[in-house]
């Protein structure tokens, strides 16, 4: 179990306690997910004692009925959560110990509260890099959930393509996608805001859907994903509404060639930066290198963006079980944008994608 690995890390690194404060990380180790809003939600793991979840009293029964089979302690809004955390820690270990914290997540205020309860403790060690490395390799169970999320993304593309017509807004198309995911697939949460971009808007990669309307002979870019049993999907497709121009076709085919070459190259032994270069070199040789303005890909898992980063300067050697996106893009301001994206997993036989929506340039007939 992953929790056993964390406890072993505590022993090997001479840490006594890990204070896990990121809700996604807590879910990774316990199977229990919640949004604490402004309240305290933490997992405390000890090198030589039983771990416990600490959460609002509102969520105690939910946590006890989840996959988690360990202790759960709660607090009322009228109580001091830090005193209660301290009481439960002291029942398990002494006052003088070394804590490992998630430095990228723990707020300064919460850190100060912990220091106030444990003035003789050390909080200098960071557990984040160990967790990042642990989450880098997906289990077969995790991959199955990622595949499920990918299937939902494929469904979403179909809904989006069918919704395109002259005069419809980007927001309307995005809304139809989100609605149909809920009523037909039972999706409760998208992994990020559904992006639909028509025409020149697609040259702004992270611009959300606007009230801009789709017009004939434009490219329409979709970037979307869902949360499936706690795991994310993230995929992009670009389609032509009406007759694409020669230049629209050209940038699409260059981007598609770059993505396919990277997918074929994503095998054990290649480094992250080498994989980025496979796609980037194709786009650059075609004359569009200045318009590929982001990394080739990012990790995928319980977060829609996580380690590893498929980017120049990252010499990480890719191995079996690593999951990430491959998403080259070409964005020409004032004209159009193209991005084709699939997430997948590195296997001994190559890169297996979680999404399967066709990548030939789809031409949607003009319709009112």
Swiss-Prot record:
Keyword field: Cytoplasm, Dipeptidase, Hydrolase, Manganese, Metal-binding, Metalloprotease, Protease
Positions with a binding annotation for Mn(2+) 2: 223, 234, 341
Location(s) in or outside the cell: Cytoplasm
GO biological process, one term: proteolysis
Principal location class: cytoplasm
Cofactor note: Binds 2 manganese ions per subunit.
Protein name in UniProt: Xaa-Pro dipeptidase
Species of provenance: Lactobacillus helveticus
Taxonomy of the source species: Bacteria, Bacillati, Bacillota, Bacilli, Lactobacillales
